[in-house]
A protein has these predicted regions:
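Non-catalytic terminal/accessory segments
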Residues: 1-202
Length: 202
């Protein structure tokens, strides 16, 4: 029974988090291979991770426990029962995978009369994103600028403030802070460039 299997596995996440540890071990190996610039090894380890049962369990758990878990995509599907979650784990594959269209909704901007658009993927697409993020994160965090703090794992606004303070506290430090915003940044990301240059399963 797939529902019982999920319930048993889900319980193990709390009592014996072995599935998560297995994924984290492979992520550590990916980060080490990235540091050593062994890109073929990075690809092999990334393939192993994204095709492992433990990583698929973790990906489904991520998308069924976050804030958007009650918001469906264009297919109207949600994974709420144990059976649905385990079936999702067993069905996750990149074989002939094609992402479905995004569901577009508009939410109010805080303190403004205008609304901003949000694109909602299906649960399956979210799980695939979470699965591949597990492989991409150790690469990104190993190679990223150490002075970058936005949308980074284990980094927050307080870290950015602390770094700014360190840069400005000396007598000969810079005396100017420039604030800028890139208009439509995420709407204009060059996805083709990313596909060509990210060393994962090219």
């Amino acid at each position: 029974d797939v529902g019982w299997e999920w319930a048993k596995t889900n319980e193990l996440f709390f009592i014996y988090p072995g599935q998560k540890r297995m994924s984290e071990y492979t992520q550590t190996r990916i980060a080490k291979a990235t540091q050593e610039r062994k890109w073929n090894l990075v690809k092999r380890l990334s393939y192993l991770l994204t095709h492992s049962h433990s990583a698929k369990l973790l990906a489904v758990r991520i998308v069924t426990r976050n804030k958007g878990r009650r918001t469906p995509g264009v297919d109207g599907e949600l994974w709420t029962s144990a059976s649905e979650k385990m079936r999702a784990v067993l069905s996750l594959t990149d074989h002939q995978y094609r992402a479905q269209p995004l569901r577009r909704i508009y939410i109010p901007k805080p303190g403004k009369t205008t609304k901003r658009p949000i694109s909602i993927p299906t649960m399956y697409d979210r799980a695939m994103q979470a699965l591949y993020a597990l492989a991409l994160q150790p690469i990104a965090e190993t190679t990223a600028d150490t002075r970058s703090f936005g949308f980074r794992l284990y980094r927050c606004a307080q870290d950015a403030s602390r770094y700014a303070y360190t840069c400005l506290r000396g007598k000969s430090s810079n005396s100017w802070i420039l604030e800028g915003d890139i208009k439509g940044c995420f709407d204009n990301i060059a996805h083709e460039w990313l596909r060509e240059h990210v060393p994962v399963l090219r």
